[in-house]
Amino acid sequence: SSDLEDKVTWDWFLLLVSKTGMRFSEALALTPKDFDFSHQTLSISKTWDYKGNGGFLPTKNKSSVRKIQMDWLTVMQFARLVKNLPEDKPIFVEGTVYNSTVNGILERHCKNAGIPVISVHGLRHTHASLLLFAGVSIASVARRLGHASMTTTQKTYLHIIQELESKDVDIIMRSLSNLN
């Protein structure tokens, strides 16, 4: 992220999506006013109509309205980035936005880094997977992603949850064998 410039680019957008796990349309709808730098949070309360004529729309569901905690480095970077931008205007939207444009930029970055190509939505999945592997509860991950229920999270990340459960079984068995 040290290569990022001090002007708004899709790279900043990709960084924010990967650090927060928010949806593409939620990230597009962000305005400087949505950032609470002193509390290190980001308010998600709307989406951007990128498939239609542009403009703000409601979130996917009631649970999608949420505050996402951010790390201090991201807070510092975005405080500087949005400092002189209009409070109520979307940070990343200039004219018509195509999902394919942003996915193309991400694809180029993936290829340059020599890693498998993923989409912007793939960044959301990666974010959630990293949290689950770090031991964050399913309930917390569901809240952070704005899922309507934990069931959504459990279904979507079943493969990871199963992998973690088999790790847990190993830990349990080791603990039990040490009880002699």
Give the location of each predicted region.
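Basic, Lys/Arg- and aromatic-enriched nucleic-acid-binding interface segment
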Residues: 2-30
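Short, cationic motifs built from Arg/Lys/His that form the positively charged side of catalytic pockets
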Residues: 9, 22-25, 66-68, 82, ...
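Structural motif
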Residues: 34, 39-41
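Short basic/aromatic active-site micro-motif
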Residues: 9-11, 95-100, 116-135
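Active-site/catalytic core of tyrosine-dependent DNA strand-transfer enzymes
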Residues: 47, 71-116
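C-terminal catalytic core of tyrosine-transesterase DNA break-rejoin enzymes
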Residues: 15, 19-26, 105-110, 124-148, ...
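C-terminal secondary-structure termini that scaffold catalytic or DNA-interacting sites
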Residues: 39, 52-76, 80, 84, ...
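Phosphate-coordinating loops and pocket residues in cytosolic domains that bind phosphorylated ligands
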Residues: 29, 37, 155
